[in-house]
Each structure stands twice: as C-alpha cells, then as structure tokens.
C-alpha cells in the first residue's frame, strides 16, 4: 500500500466485528509504529494491549461507570472548550455522524445508546493503550504519543484493520490500570480501539471531512 493510500484511506471506525485480531498482527503493526519520530529520540511511549477477556472486562466496567453517571477522571485532561472555528468542526462532526447513522436530533435514547457503545469501544476486540511515565513533561510526551499512535493507525489500515482514537478509553484510568496491570506512576494518554471494521454499519463507513489546504497553510 502506498503512503498516500494509507493516509487518505484511514478513517475512524465506530462499529467493529467481534472477530479477534491475531496478536502477531498487532506485533507486526507495532514493529512499524515504533519507528515514529519523537523528541530527542526519547521514545517515551509504553504500549499495553487489551484483548480477549481483558477487553470485555474493561468494556463492562467503563459502561457501568458511564451508566452510573460517574465523572471521568482522565490522567490527561480532555478539552472542554475550543476556539470558535474548532468548536464548529467538532459540532459538525457530531451532526454529520448522527445523520449518517440515522439518529434524529431529538432522539436522546439513540444518542445515549451511541455514547454507551462508545464506552464499550464500539465493539472492538482490542484496545491499544499508550502510556507515559508520570514524571514526564506532558506536552512533549503527548506530542510523541500522537506521533506513534497515528503511525500505528496507518500501519493497521495497511493490514486491513480499522482504528479509532478513543477518548472514552481513558475516562477511568484507575480501572484500566487495575485490569491491565499498569503501574500507578504511569499516565494513560490514549487508547486506540482496533479491529475489523463492520462492512455495512453506517458508523463504520462514515468519514469526516478535512479543511482545504489553503485554509490551514500559508507561505510566509
């Protein structure tokens, strides 16, 4: 697969098949992703893969916490506000996704089911967690996690797998640390759900838009 095809073809998958992802395939993807650039070649990432029974335990526990209305307590703060232009894109994404899924604006039950499904990783059979040492400078370390995480997504796409950066996967890091034996002094930065995309579900076929290059780039 050409790089252009991987970059342009990847999309965020929100409906997965239950078929397990072979561990050797995840290892193959990680072998590629580990070559991602990092500040000073520090490679601050540690990768923990939840699959099989561990994924199910996490999904059940996260969904239970969401059902209780438990406030998320992520190790890395999730943005709650944006500049107007960014907020517009965020709102548009939700509107376009729900339209593609056939969820009406006032259908709070359907929206609630979607968010609960999100806490269950959209049915993905595995979640790849990226953690950092708690003593690290967060901005630089998180930049590096974005580097390896995105490379991981492209490599997964090349292998016929779908992925999604999933903030819901790090809403309750204490649970993730307990289930996955992650030391308390580590910070869970993000989880990437991975699996085989559902071939017909609108949530798996949906693709978000991007700004034209002239809107984001200028020559000084």
Segments and roles (model prediction):
Residues 1-220:
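Acidic, surface-exposed loops and disordered segments
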